[in-house]
């Protein structure tokens, strides 16, 4: 029989329906707390659980007194809403290790031969301690503590592992938090926040629109299943610090939310995942590496659990408030390593001298781009239209096929032509740079016919390739449709030497914006289990250290050349720990309303410590791709950009960046105008907000027209106006709006930080359409009405007090 158990807090009066909670005597101040007994009134008083209760400012937690399992979690904002759906067989921690054959094995708390759980404290706070010994009859012990005070926001969790069994522990999963699929409240409000996804952040809703979006529903299989294999980190970038850009998860509905985070300031490697674990879903954390083969280690940081009310912005704000106090969070306006040319927000334009038309055909070399000097008049057309300087990113230049590092030299157009083109660009006030393909070794390219087996052997490639626990080379998987490549380990000296040599050579050509770590998503270091590299044989904090070491060598190369204008970037949002190492980050955002709607500007909300660019990437619906993408870049604080075509226009298609130029998509004139207006606002009155500021939770905006159309059999429904709230250094408040349509849009804006005006001089509306205009915007307190011209953007800026 399935029972629902309820608890009674000392803060609640009376018994809750369906349950009675008994406080046993003998738990006086300073003495060990006795467990409470939960009885079900409908079962004749039969005991169903023995529990310890811990309380914080915002929630009440209950633990099984026999094994320390978290069995109840209730927010004080919704005391009748149970978050937990813990099954009796769920462990409280798991340990993944490698056996003598270097195969993965897993141990759980349920295999402990000795278990002791105590709870000490009084009304001022309690500490739950659980100790587990002789796990699977090995000389292996785990102890964890949970500390909670009714005056503090979070419960704090810590764990210590003592390994005298001599096994190689790869990771420890802790805590074990299994939440209910159904939380009650408004069903459509149930949402999950994940600080990782290919564009910037992911929001999974319980009941999304009918667009194929993922849903929180185990029946539909939208979440991957929890299993031992799900936590085997042997390749890729899906970890922190890396593609997982921050260390928190949030799960909420319209009534309350649960927040889980690691407060790690030193870049220890971990994975945070949301997985299907019947009867609920699991908010999981695995802590990788640095566990001793002999001896003890306490986790170097706390895991915190707390509650919140609101939406994903409110959950993310909790994490941001902590993250911005850490060593990596130097505000952009205080950084001294960001060159002036980048602070001027040049429009980023990608040039592809080597073109794989649809990622299925042999390489094409466009005659319009070679020799490289032919690009200059085409770029001049772009610069004239957008009325801004350019950052020209050369892509697909490799002799052996696009993205075929490291055997890629010489450039297909020749180095002399390239250097001359860089000079011509610099004469016009532009910068030239490139994207590489990160720390991997391409040994075969289908489009160019390249076979690099001999080069791989000649240059000792095997010495720098990442290895699986069995010692096999790690083959990349996502790129197999057009090339074959190995992941390379930054913990191998050869990997770093080749990388530094290539970056040094590019600096010598005059390149300044360099994205070497393209495809190391989020500035990730690939995991490696090699026995002969400069690191322990498995993932761990060495990965963070080797990224720092590599970036320091890049900086020495630019300083040694006197190239102070060189910047480094990485694909997607640079993870928080690596923010000081990079000056810009290539965020491939998906615009509002795009397809499944899972993408959210989480990265842009959390971090603005390096400059965000969009360049050639980003998703937006056709045939208005450039207009929509540029409008989204505007309100989310990114430099706009696009792909150059042979007639000096942008590729205005929602397609891969290597797509064919013809037939054209959308209006070239509208694309130019949207980029121009966005850039004018960003470089002008919006600079303190969009460049140096911080994104806030958005205002309420009424009157936004939904634009609906069908194009190439794809239905689209996109808001006509995008908007975001921002705060400049010093506290000035502003609301940024962008109208990507060719129609005038009138909106009503509501926000508590909009003061009432008498003379109309407290708030100004600064618009960027055909000309940059500044005008007073009078109105009642908390309200303003705004009219946006077609293809325009604006900022409602509250004057400094």
Region spans (language model):
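Carbohydrate-recognition beta-sandwich/jelly-roll modules
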Residues: 54-65, 69-76, 81-391, 412, ...
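Active-site-proximal substrate-binding groove within the catalytic cores of carbohydrate-active enzymes
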Residues: 284, 296-302, 543-771
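Aromatic- and glycine-enriched glycan-recognition loops and surfaces
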Residues: 357-460, 497-498, 542-552
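Active-site-adjacent "subsite" loops/lids of carbohydrate-active enzymes
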Residues: 438-505, 599, 603
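C-terminal beta-strand-rich structural cap/linker in extracellular carbohydrate-active enzymes
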Residues: 778-801
